[in-house]
Amino acid sequence: LKTNRFLNTCQCLETYSCCYRNEEAKKVRVSDPNKTKGVTLKHRIEDLLIEASPCLGITRDQCSTLADTISNARNYYTHYDKKRTKPTFECISASTELLHFILLLVVYSLLGIPENAINECKKYTPYKNMTYYIGEIK
């Protein structure tokens, strides 16, 4: 169940990025030292994390590391890439909560909800433990 929620949330954010943030994701790809031919899920998640970083209180380097871990976890499950390490339950759970919060940020921003009201969401379950979740994504 947790894995399905993780995969569905990844897909939602990847689709949003493809439709509405493709240029921003391309800029992340260009700055990636391990450039690929195209924009990958890692670049899309990293772009969204960078956009959300003021609210999340994370650095640019953390955005890259988190995006890499999340992308590897998604690839493990969707491509049955057994060369990768199976993500832990804690990593999947924490990644799911982080991605779900980013999805809320996207939706609330599109609805015109002010940033200070969005920041209030972090005080409520399950988002009050966002710092803990970020630390569990490894």
Q: What positions do the PLM features span?
A:
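Amphipathic, oligomerization/interface secondary-structure segments
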Residues: 1-138
